[in-house]
Amino acid sequence: MNKAVFIDRDGTINEEVDYLKHADDLSVFPYAIEALQILKNKGFKNIIVTNQSGIARGFFTEEDLKLIHEKLLGITNKITPLIDGIYYSPYHTEGTIEEYKIESDLRKPRIGMVLKAREEHSIDLNSSFFIGDTYTDMKTAQNAGLKKILVLTGYGARDLQKCLDENIQLDFIAADLLDASNHINNLPN
């Protein structure tokens, strides 16, 4: 079994923008590659899990998202593969595109993306983490039995209080993805 770090995309690996629609607008945090490398060196699979309701809302297409992810992988995997998988949910019940306007177990805080990655990458959830910037990310981690690290980038500073109010027991609060990776790296094996 493998251990993994499930990582939210927007606000965690890259700058949060209102519905990232175009690959040209992708701005990866300057420390993201170092952070991902630290986790790889520690023996973790890096798995991105991201809600992309902009597809259901008609703001962009799955083809647009594919181009964004290709650019992300081109940046992060330039020297060595640092991202082992990308899982996304294009669904939202308030969408305008009928095929995506549904309830889905893939949409966080449900754990469908985590379970799919577990199956495809033979992941032991008990030895795995989730790093994200929202209450929804931390709720997903809680629902999946993962260790929870909230980063204060993106919406993290905003959602910290909600996590506390909703009794989400955070394992660590990190300034950013690099701080979170260093925290994991410093834990005993």
Positions of PLM-derived features:
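Non-catalytic pre-domain segments flanking phosphatase-related domains
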Residues: 1-7, 182, 186-189
